[in-house]
């Protein structure tokens, strides 16, 4: 039985929860989004067929350039004439990168698709000064070195990049420059102060940990005056968290992410010692599946289950829209993304259509209405540690709906 409380409208839904992520890894950017040699390439080297899909889905926000890649990325390598840009070794993915895609190209991509740019700075091998210079290059208005560097490239007006991430997954031993929560918070404080000195209007998103309440507490405690969000990442299937062959487990994933959101918010409240803190949660990397470069190439793996889970996770973010304002599906193109490309064109995978629907419908809503669902329950394995739950759902209705309670049988 499904009950819809049409009077009970809650929480404005941020369009940025329907955002996406791209990284210098495999064919997420090169050979797909950016491919000057493609017959689909425009004058700037971007594939027009991919741009069209990004515009169709009304992509609201793009996070770049990583990801693990960013922890050894130096933004100045990707500036200036392409033939003069250095080819570097990427420690994260054990590959070479020729830096053909850089800051200016990324800004052009956002302009072409209408997406809000979200840049993540290097807190692995990078410095606070380097990050501050990047902000100056993008947003500087004075007669200064890095603002003038942008002007020399033909961009008199600043890029007005509002959102900046303070490193990527710095808690993980797979990360270049990994550190403890205390070390990260201290280092991030220096980065945040330097970047805010350059442009006080920017919003900073600190590195959080989906399974690390102590980490999130410490980050919130130290950085509370300077950050707007704490970012957490989650890939449900593929890292021994959920088993793809267990249908009931998989259908629990959206509720599991809601619980992770609540735990992260509780850590932020505790760390700031402020129940009314404005610091939000950003799910700026998420996918139903982990990155598995061989398995992900098989488009037969993307089925109705992916569609249902993707929709369920987006519903989780909508239900938590008082806390969650940013989310980035990771990645959008290739690997386990919503679309796949090859030399002949673009394939829209099953989960793509969820984003096309949700971004067009929910971004027009002032909020969502309360619903309650009652039905059969089922037990989950001890590894998940929740059982006999009752499902809850949220639906967007026309704001002009009459005030009423609607009851219906759900099959």
Task: Show where each model-derived region lies.
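Active-site-proximal helices and loops of the catalytic beta/alpha 8
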Residues: 237, 254, 258
């Amino acid at each position: 039985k499904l009950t819809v409380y049409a009077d009970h409208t809650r929480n404005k839904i941020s369009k940025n929860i329907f955002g996406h992520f791209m990284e210098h890894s495999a064919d997420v950017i090169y050979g797909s989004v950016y491919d000057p040699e493609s017959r689909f390439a425009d004058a700037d080297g971007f594939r027009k067929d991919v741009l069209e899909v990004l515009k169709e889905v009304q992509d609201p926000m793009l996070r770049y350039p990583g990801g693990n890649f960013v922890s050894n990325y130096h933004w100045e390598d990707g500036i200036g004439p392409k033939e003069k840009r250095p080819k570097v070794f990427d420690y994260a993915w054990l590959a070479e990168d020729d830096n053909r895609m850089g800051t200016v190209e990324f800004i052009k991509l956002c302009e072409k698709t209408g997406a809000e740019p979200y840049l993540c700075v290097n807190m692995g091998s990078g410095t606070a000064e380097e990050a501050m210079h990047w902000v100056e290059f993008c947003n500087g208005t004075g007669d200064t070195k890095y603002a003038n560097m942008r002007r020399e490239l033909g961009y008199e007006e600043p890029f007005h990049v509002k959102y900046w991430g303070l490193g990527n997954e710095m808690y993980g031993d797979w990360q270049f420059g990994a550190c403890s929560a205390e070390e990260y918070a201290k280092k991030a404080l220096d980065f945040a102060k330097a970047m805010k000195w350059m442009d006080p209007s920017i919003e900073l998103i600190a590195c959080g940990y989906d399974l690390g309440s102590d980490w999130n507490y410490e980050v919130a405690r130290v950085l509370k005056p300077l950050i707007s969000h704490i970012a957490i990442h989650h890939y449900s299937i593929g890292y021994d968290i959920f088993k793809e062959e267990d249908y009931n487990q998989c259908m629990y994933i959206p509720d599991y992410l809601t619980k992770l959101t609540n735990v992260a918010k509780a850590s932020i409240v505790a760390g700031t010692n402020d129940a009314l803190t404005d610091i939000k949660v950003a799910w700026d990397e998420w996918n139903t599946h982990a990155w598995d470069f061989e398995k992900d190439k098989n488009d037969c793996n993307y089925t109705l289950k992916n569609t249902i889970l993707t929709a369920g996770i987006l519903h989780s973010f909508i239900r938590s829209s008082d806390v969650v304002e940013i989310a980035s599906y990771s990645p959008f193109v290739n690997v386990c993304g919503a679309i796949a490309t090859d030399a002949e064109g673009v394939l829209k995978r099953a989960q793509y259509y969820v984003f096309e629907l949700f971004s067009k419908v929910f971004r027009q809503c002032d909020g969502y209405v309360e619903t309650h669902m009652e039905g059969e329950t089922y037990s989950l394995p001890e590894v998940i540690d929740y059982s006999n739950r009752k499902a809850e759902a949220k639906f967007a209705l026309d704001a002009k709906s009459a005030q009423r309670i609607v009851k219906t049988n759900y099959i």
